[in-house]
Amino acid sequence: MLLRTVILFALAAVAEIGGAWLIWQAVREGRPFWWAGLGVMALGAYGFIATLQADASFGRILAAYGGVFVAGSLLWGTVVDGYRPDRWDVIGAVVCLVGVAVIMAAPRGQGA
């Protein structure tokens, strides 16, 4: 189940961050406007991917995904745009990922 969660979060990040990046490229960087259309489709795919998580709590999934989004955005910027995160970016991303682990892996049940 953990592997499935990680894979779905990674796919969601690629769809959301990639979609937003495509729109950014069309609007801010002068790429063809059809890039924005592809971005909108990728953002729509992100919405569907989130529903595939095993946990039924929308709030929990989206809150945990937020941490993945933070780290994934920095990674995307580094790989795709040549952005160089500083130590505070990295520390912030690690804090977010620790939060993701707490939210998703905490033992839950009666009295939790």
Curated annotation (Swiss-Prot):
Subcellular location: Cell membrane
Main location per the UniProt record: membrane
GO cellular component terms given for this protein: plasma membrane
Membrane topology classification: Multi-pass membrane protein
Keyword Nucleotide-binding: no
Listed transmembrane segments: 6-26, 32-52, 61-81, 87-107
Keywords: Cell membrane, Membrane, Transmembrane, Transmembrane helix
Pfam families linked to this entry: UPF0060
The keyword Transmembrane belongs to this UniProt entry's keyword annotation: yes
Highest taxon of the lineage: Bacteria
Record-stated family: Belongs to the UPF0060 family.
Record protein name field: UPF0060 membrane protein CMS0846
Provenance organism: Clavibacter sepedonicus
